[in-house]
Amino acid sequence: MRYLTAGESHGPSLTAIIEGIPAGLTLHPADIDHELQRRQGGYGRGARMSIETDQVQISSGVRHGKTTGAPITLTVINKDHQKWLDVMAVGDIEETLKLKRRVKHPRPGHADLVGGIKYHFNDLRDALERSSARETTMRVAVGAVAKRILAELGVDMLHHILIFGGITITIPSKLSFRELQERALHSELSIVNPKQEEEIKTYIDKIKKEGDTIGGIIETIVQGVPAGLGSYVQWDKKLDAKLAQAVLSINAFKGVEFGVGFDMGFQKGSQVMDEITWTPTQGYGRQTNHLGGFEGGMTTGQLLVVKGVMKPIPTLYKPLMSVDIDSHEPYKATVERSDPTALPAAGVIMENVVATVLAKEILETFSSTTMSELQKAFSDYRAYVKQF
């Protein structure tokens, strides 16, 4: 399985092409639209999400509600493009129009300046448009297809926010996977403690009035992945490493942890390692899950626990100082539409990116020309692991 995305933030549309999806997977536009709507939700989202009502168009690879095994083409129309026809025109236009909405005051923390240097841009909008988080629309669309594969194999997942702009969420003890999932899904903030909702909403409103932004830490948990996905035999075969790269490729993500993560640096080996158990009914297990479901770059059969840290959005309504790329004089950075926080949306993106990596690994590991073939191979492997 592989995919490419294309499109600009204010261009006519966004596109993804996915190759390697088994034939016979039940797939409808509504499956993808559901995930796209989740991405657009969450408290703190700004004006752009009130303009766009993202809906996917599937133009290849699916017929009568089933995948055919051919490449799948997904497209999402940018409604806001109608206001940017001159700025984003494909053909050559008058010089005066080219200067319309030209970006020459790069934003600290964004790709504007370095992108302009790398690709020799006189207008930094050429970097801004592609590097925008709008691209993650298609990452979610691809992830929605991946989640359909995982669902057919009994793999489920959730995400929730652990830290919201410096406010640590108190996680109620002994919540099951399903309880965590339900609480997060029914929260505008993707948190599992409803008692903290108003405190955080008030804080977001305060940040918005200040023209500032906040980041935080997101946790994605996956249930139903058997032991043995990934490999230790080469550095690039390790599944946790693949997940780390994918999560860090999401806009504004700056760090990844598995299990208790960086807290391991403060603990002894006897406190961190997960003792191995065995029962006739369950097979092998672990007393704890400090390592987040990974050993040697391979899944252990425990819950996969992946955490990602998102920096505050770099576009500020009270912009920081920058430099004019023409005169090299100090100027305030360019202001584009922005949100005080995008953590709930980023959680949806992270969840779908993790789903994509896991689906890809499964498709590469098991015979998967058709879904029925994949389901049998996956089921047989589960049975093997249980009796090992």
Curated annotation (Swiss-Prot):
Pathway assigned in UniProt: Metabolic intermediate biosynthesis; chorismate biosynthesis; chorismate from D-erythrose 4-phosphate and phosphoenolpyruvate: step 7/7
Lineage summary: Bacteria, Bacillati, Bacillota, Bacilli, Lactobacillales
Cofactor: FMNH2
Signal sequence region: none
Annotated PROSITE patterns: CHORISMATE_SYNTHASE_1, CHORISMATE_SYNTHASE_2, CHORISMATE_SYNTHASE_3
Cofactor note: Reduced FMN (FMNH(2)).
Reactions listed under catalytic activity: 5-O-(1-carboxyvinyl)-3-phosphoshikimate = chorismate + phosphate
Gene of this entry: aroC
GO molecular-function term, one example from the UniProt record: FMN binding
Coiled coil segments of this chain: none
Protein name from the UniProt record: Chorismate synthase
GO cellular component, one term: cytosol
Subunit details: Homotetramer.
Family, as annotated: Belongs to the chorismate synthase family.
Matching InterPro entries: Chorismate_synth, Chorismate_synth_AroC_sf, Chorismate_synthase_CS
Record EC number: 4.2.3.5
NCBIfam families: aroC, PRK05382.1
Listed GO biological process terms: amino acid biosynthetic process; aromatic amino acid family biosynthetic process; chorismate biosynthetic process
PANTHER family: CHORISMATE SYNTHASE
